[in-house]
UniProtKB/Swiss-Prot annotation:
This is LEAF RUST 10 DISEASE-RESISTANCE LOCUS RECEPTOR-LIKE PROTEIN KINASE-like 2.1. Residues 30-264 are extracellular. Residues 321-609 form the Protein kinase domain. It is a single-pass type I membrane protein. It comes from Arabidopsis thaliana (Mouse-ear cress).
Amino acid sequence: MINLSLYQTNSLSYTIIWMLFVIPSCVLSVDERQKHCSPTFRCGKQTDLYYPFWSPDREECGHPVFKVNCSGDFAEFTISTVKFHVLEMNYESRIIRLVRTEYLNNLCPWHPENRSINQEVLPFLQDTELGTFYYNCSGPTVDELANGYIRQLGCDEEVGGKSYFVSSPSHPGNRAILDGLSASCERNVDIPVSRSAMETTATNQSLEAIKKVLDVGFELGFNSDCSLCVASKGACGFNQSSKAFVCYCKDEPHEHTCGKMGIGIGLGCGFLGATLITVCLLCFFFQKRRTSHHLRPRDNNLKGLVQLKQYSYAEVRKITKLFSHTLGKGGFGTVYGGNLCDGRKVAVKILKDFKSNGEDFINEVASMSQTSHVNIVSLLGFCYEGSKRAIVYEFLENGSLDQFLSEKKSLNLDVSTLYRIALGVARGLDYLHHGCKTRIVHFDIKPQNILLDDTFCPKVSDFGLAKLCEKRESILSLLDARGTIGYIAPEVFSGMYGRVSHKSDVYSYGMLVLEMIGAKNKEIEETAASNSSSAYFPDWIYKNLENGEDTWKFGDEISREDKEVAKKMTLVGLWCIQPSPLNRPPMNRIVEMMEGSLDVLEVPPKPSIHYSAEPLPQLSSFSEENSIYTEVFIGSTS
């Protein structure tokens, strides 16, 4: 009698042995440049560098402009005669942080030149903006700008004479003043700076504060071609003949990504492919009954995640010291504090009840893996083992915003800090809606999901309810209402208000802003005082605006500037919570409103309670394109 099990085992063994001999001759004819450029290299104290940077022995592996000098602690490259230090290379988040060498702790270098960075290779991130230095100016002294920041530098006569540093030089409101200033100055130099670092000068306008802004450096993104090339197992390089990016692959160079092997290799390996398919089918058939942990169809979505660390569950237990330090609990799981082996503090979210639905995990990892922004929490890795699911992201020292909006701690944050937090959240949402290749709609914006670092820089977190859609699209189809009561847009509940879209996040943001300044919380007091449960929430906000009572929880003791900021936040919040999505501004417009002057902000139209089954009318021109947006599903809804 034939032992079928033994026969199958021996057959599989023979097949594997045969493949070990066939594969090397069939598919491992690797292009030497792919082998040469795949490893990273060290420069000074910095490790793991690759494209666009290159050292003398790796010329074909980088862009010609970015040859680095490794004689010091930091990698340094030169554009024309201008040198830049590479402060940080973060390939996980795809961020490069640079600083102009001659401006390190020096505002008045000798005859600086105006040189720009090729943004086709290293594009500016959303947090990067241009500042301008004006040197040897002969015109009248300029002390202030209505729509920006200007500071006289005090350079020596032989170096720079009467000189200035200006932020937001491209703002239309500054054009007349700066055109005159530029004409009277001998030299103008544009310097990229960090927008979030520049915000610190609002409270500290000293020259030392400007130096610190420059020393922090500015952030650039990676060339998207290189990211796609690496994801396809290629190595990034530069074609000297065509003067263009090239992806070195195992078979031959390609323009963007590694595609299929050549026809000859494909024909030679066709039989091997058929054999592999047969073996896989046999293994699947015999293993199906013997395992209880099957991969769900939606799990395959994680195969598209690249350059992310995948941790085992044992590693997660070690990182969190057996889950000994609980940071918080939510509807999707528990968050624990921990430390990576390099000492970095992290937060680890363990998703609960994964067996019932894995879409929350897929949503969060797929959404966060596509983001890289100062106001979006950084994803560092994930665990995907059996039924265990965990997400590892950066640790934020000040926790979530909601604890600072409670009665006990509300006075700890002044108007200026709350404004910076609200502006940062707006920029983060603007990035999700308009800055990513695939638009991300969060659907759960609330104080508990806004994390704060040690400088109270806000970061949007918790993407468990997020949806992805193509940028050209706007309308999402939802099979279930999602979000938190009090922050959910009305169209999520009822189609009479309009279609669900990224404008649903705008509504949640408006409720968040009103809560931050105390306007939302006062609803309870007003309703209780009037003994009416039918009063429409914004009614009393409009009444207070008409009566000039717009300081909310801050009282009358705050300064005139802070009162204007509180009123601006109120108006922006009211625009955001308009019942019809068509009447809400998009997030990029909200950022402009928050950054702009209060004088140009109009009081939004006062909505009325609308019970008709007809859609609400459009009251403003804030609506974006009318093309229908189809949802890009990242997980099965079954």
